[in-house]
């Protein structure tokens, strides 16, 4: 049996793997207006999915949308001003790309590590370290 026949046989006998394409999913932001404030209802669920601190994510949101923000007693983020779901979602996508996804392997298995004034993204999957 030559290589091509072995390869064909292996491909025929391999099991079909089904499931979702990714195991990492950030919930879509659930935002609503409350007066002149935008309330991010599922902020805690987003933090759980990202495995990041609320202070870091909230600071990024504030800087990107150019407003002040706080966390209320229910754990919801309150952004001063009116921001739509799309704007918050795009901001979260930018956060994930910068602070969660490994630039080398593309996996979300990362930790943020502080070294002096520098923040590094350390990938648990491939071992890469990059400054963010």
Curated annotation (Swiss-Prot):
Record's function text: eIF-2 functions in the early steps of protein synthesis by forming a ternary complex with GTP and initiator tRNA.
Protein name: Translation initiation factor 2 subunit beta
UniProt KW keywords: Initiation factor, Protein biosynthesis
Gene3D superfamilies: 3.30.30.170
One MF term in the entry's GO annotations: translation initiation factor activity
SMART domains: eIF2B_5
Keyword Protein biosynthesis: yes
Subunit: Heterotrimer composed of an alpha, a beta and a gamma chain.
InterPro entries listed in its UniProt record: IF2/IF5 (IPR045196), TIF2_bsu_arc (IPR004458), Transl_init_fac_IF2/IF5_dom (IPR002735), Transl_init_fac_IF2/IF5_N (IPR016189), Transl_init_fac_IF2/IF5_Zn-bd (IPR016190)
NCBIfam families (UniProt xref): PRK03988.1 (NF003067)
Family (UniProt): Belongs to the eIF-2-beta/eIF-5 family.
Location of region: Disordered: 1-30
Gene, per the UniProt record: eif2b
Pfam families, per the entry: eIF-5_eIF-2B
SUPFAM superfamilies given in the database record: Translation initiation factor 2 beta, aIF2beta, N-terminal domain, Zinc-binding domain of translation initiation factor 2 beta
